[in-house]
Amino acid sequence: MGKKSRVKTQKSGSGAAAAVSPKEMLNLISELLQKCSNPNSTPGREWEEYVQIRGLVEKIRKKQRGLSVVFDGKREDYFPELMEWCKENGASTDGFELVEFPEEGFGLKATREIKAEELFLWVPRKLLMTVESAKGSVLGPLYSQDRILQAMGNITLAFHLLCERADPNSFWLPYIKTLPNEYDTPLYFNEDEVQYLQSTQAILDVFSQYKNTARQYAYFYKVIQTHPNANKLPLKDSFTFDDYRWAVSSVMTRQNQIPTEDGSRVTLALIPLWDMCNHTNGLITTGYNLEDDRCECVALQDFKSGEQIYIFYGTRSNAEFVIHNGFFFENNLHDRVKIKLGVSKSDRLYAMKAEVLARAGIPTSSVFALHVTEPPISAQLLAFLRVFCMNEDELKGHLIGDHAIDKIFTLGNSEFPVSWENEIKLWTFLEARASLLLKTYKTTVEDDNKVLEQPDMTFHSAMAIKLRRVEKEILEKALKSASDNRKLYSKNSEEGTPLPKYEASNIAFVENSVADSKLPVVLKSLDDEEVKLQEAITISEITENGFLNDKDLLPNGTKSENDSFLAEDNQQETGNAKDFCS
């Protein structure tokens, strides 16, 4: 989170582009909105659409050159002011300092010994930028009228940030001046750097992120120019794409969920000082103390004086880190690759499979994950694959009979196979699927290693290549695991090994050995996509206002199967208004 800015943004008023007529700009904005509001692009033509959208954005950026607002000097010049501001307003500032590290950029360095689980950092609510503080700001009147802002807290925070940045008297200015001028998310990649992500499992999310950001910008550009409640916003005379990209990136890399003051629900917040901590493997050690009304963080481990203080951001994959945080984390224990699976409606046994899956709380089509750790599949994916590969008799056994419910509960437990034949089928299927996915890449792991040795490799290019390399490494591990399991269960079948037996009365309490999951599966939170089905704005409402042509677009989140409360970046916000921005 403390990653330094690498490229200097042009200062307002210096070398500004020639004046562009409002009509000319509105025409370009309308063209961009129309292009970004088209239905899903034809499979295989996503790159073509991305290049077209990018071309329009670059035209707009060229005409807006020199109009973006940035601060004089370097962000680190404002660190003393940030520390003083935090101290004056009740945040902890003792025991650490803000410094630049060789690998991660800016972060917190311990100035004394800090013990594991010691409370070393707290930030009171008054310092946080939240959706609630946005409602009470100059943005409030527009927020009260705009359905998109109401539905999407992350966009509200982005505009809150922009408005406060433009106000020389803003309470949060000491914080805002320490934010990077630019970020390392794919929104800042050039076209050649994005090319390195071609054929990866993450590329569609990269395309979607860019398309969504461009659409949001075009929509709000028109809102700011035409909506009566936007008249007093300090953005009316200058709202550039670079401004919006900076704001959404600041929020995307930093936003967290905190409880509202009464504790009845959660809201999004930017947390000054705390968001300078960089990530490492571990456990969530940040929470919110409602009694003292402040965000608190205890030490993840012992830190000696002079060492960098790390926190754990949550169980994110490297695709999520690259797309939403702008860095690649080596040796990520929670890394995974998305895999889309579904039962075909043309399957003769579709109805029975759908019913068994429904009883287990699993949809017939979803996005799962292959994990870097062993075993590579979660309890939910194991359950899905077992049902996917069941024959008619096995399906009947899970639908009718005295022990049908017990069998549903064991679907996600690796210790209780449905049958040896079923187990062989599912691992054979997974082996074939992983093999097919590997064949979609244009390079091998060895090829990627050679490219990474090139001395002129840009930071963004290296990050993209590392991501595509680790995807292949995960798929190769999954392929080997599937092959080993297929051979094991084939041997059990050939030798006539009896299936493991279980006590029906105790089955719901059996701990699952797959991905640290526990039964029953039906009580587990399954998948990324389920969260995104919540809709705050219907398709009909959007089309009536001309935001979309006829249907919603792909989700832009890469949310994991398991979420953390405070340290996750709340990509569900995008899902809450998926018709507009997903």
Swiss-Prot record:
CDD domains: SET_SETD3 (cd19176). Residues 550-582 are annotated as: Disordered. It comes from the Eukaryota. One of its GO terms (molecular function) is histone H3K36 methyltransferase activity. Gene3D superfamilies: Rubisco LSMT, substrate-binding domain (3.90.1420.10), set domain protein methyltransferase, domain 1 (3.90.1410.10). Protein-histidine N-methyltransferase that specifically mediates 3-methylhistidine (tele-methylhistidine) methylation of actin at 'His-73'. Does not have protein-lysine N-methyltransferase activity and probably only catalyzes histidine methylation of actin. Belongs to the class V-like SAM-binding methyltransferase superfamily. SETD3 actin-histidine methyltransferase family. The SET domain specifically recognizes and binds actin, suggesting that it does not accommodate substrates diverging from actin. This is Actin-histidine N-methyltransferase. It comes from Xenopus tropicalis.
